[in-house]
Amino acid sequence: MVEELPSVFLVGPMGAGKTTIGRLLAKQLGRSFVDSDWYIESQTGADIAWIFAKEGEAGFRERETRAIDELTQQPQIVLATGGGAVMAAENREYLKQRGIVIYLNAPVDVQMARTAKDKSRPLLQQPNPRKILQGLYSARDPLYREVAHIIMPTGHTYPRHMVNQLLQQLNSFCISTSVDSEPEKD
């Protein structure tokens, strides 16, 4: 199954566990793991907060779209996208058409707990981060669902257990997809 599995792309809000789950999943699948934010940082030589400060969110999103385009063309990788990657229609198309998209769905309380002390998230450097997270979740959840082939709730189980569940779902997804694409026999 693993050899036939296309690239796997993780989407979801900040704090959903995309990087943690992505690393573990890549290890289990014997694949390379790439985090799109880290990729952007390595390409620019600057961290995301600096890019936001100098170029604004629009400048960052342009860089993100170029990165998503490049990364989704790589064969058999596990990619963790930034939380806002789904905001651009181009990115949603790249993700949906070039691999299997897994939406790691984390409730706002889980996001708050995981991001509370993280100063590297520019969108949360506001007086009321909970309100920001709630607004982002409301705006982005339908877009995550639009691109997702698999939806996995996060925050209530250990990462290794979640990866085992994902492997089962990926196996089921691949089996059902191959059955659906086989020509009918007379």
Curated annotation (Swiss-Prot):
ATP binds at residues 15-20, 121. It is an enzyme of class 2 (transferase). One of its GO terms (cellular component) is cytosol. Keywords: Amino-acid biosynthesis, Aromatic amino acid biosynthesis, ATP-binding, Cytoplasm, Kinase, Magnesium, Metal-binding, Nucleotide-binding, Transferase. PANTHER family: SHIKIMATE KINASE (PTHR21087), SHIKIMATE KINASE 2 (PTHR21087:SF21). Transmembrane segments: none annotated. Substrate binds at residues 37, 61, 83, 140. Gene3D superfamilies: P-loop containing nucleotide triphosphate hydrolases (3.40.50.300). It comes from the Bacteria. Its EC number is 2.7.1.71. It catalyses: shikimate + ATP = 3-phosphoshikimate + ADP + H(+). It is found in: Cytoplasm. Catalyzes the specific phosphorylation of the 3-hydroxyl group of shikimic acid using ATP as a cosubstrate. Binds 1 Mg(2+) ion per subunit. This is Shikimate kinase. SUPFAM superfamilies: P-loop containing nucleoside triphosphate hydrolases. Pfam families: SKI. Pathway: Metabolic intermediate biosynthesis; chorismate biosynthesis; chorismate from D-erythrose 4-phosphate and phosphoenolpyruvate: step 5/7. Its main location: cytoplasm. Its cofactor is Mg(2+). GO terms for molecular function: ATP binding; magnesium ion binding; shikimate kinase activity. GO terms for biological process: amino acid biosynthetic process; aromatic amino acid family biosynthetic process; chorismate biosynthetic process. Mg(2+) binds at residue 19. InterPro entries: P-loop_NTPase (IPR027417), Shikimate/glucono_kinase (IPR031322), Shikimate_kinase/TSH1 (IPR000623), Shikimate_kinase_CS (IPR023000).
